[in-house]
Amino acid sequence: YVRVCDSMQEIAEGYVNQRGGQPMRPSLFAFMSHLEGKDNIGATPDGRHAGDVLAHGINPQAGASKKGLIPMANSAASADMRKFQGGSIQVDIQPRFFDGKENRYAYIRDFSSAFFKSGGMQINLHILDLKKLEDAMEHPEKPEYQDLVVRITGYCARFITMSREYQQEFVSRMNYSSMS
């Protein structure tokens, strides 16, 4: 991961922008191209098949994080983020993740603080009930889902107004229900 990030940055800095000739700085995030670009990218060495959705941000491929939230965050923070203009991790947690933890707010504070101290740049955090998201997909007319807002990346959207494909991709990211 670090070697790929460094290589990408070295290639980009060889180019200059059209506004003052400053060296280019790559980004490690995508507003929507992780979904829209899937048909233009073949299979990848991590086991992703051609046509599958790409990983969102600097996260692993949806469903590929097998060791848990903290190892994923440590891996994401291992690249030198000062070389990039952006790179967020998507932390999509189900409420049961906090079962057995005395203070969920202290856990989030401590997790976030450790991530930033280790070099991480940005966290997009959700605590959403997977069952509610799935029900909202099937029953968008229900009053309780009219104001269900989710953070996509650099913007938010009402969940029921998203296309079915985007809803499914978003739900596929809800992979942290426990520490491991």
Predicted regions and their residues:
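Acidic, glycine-enriched catalytic cores built around paired aspartates
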Residues: Y1-S180
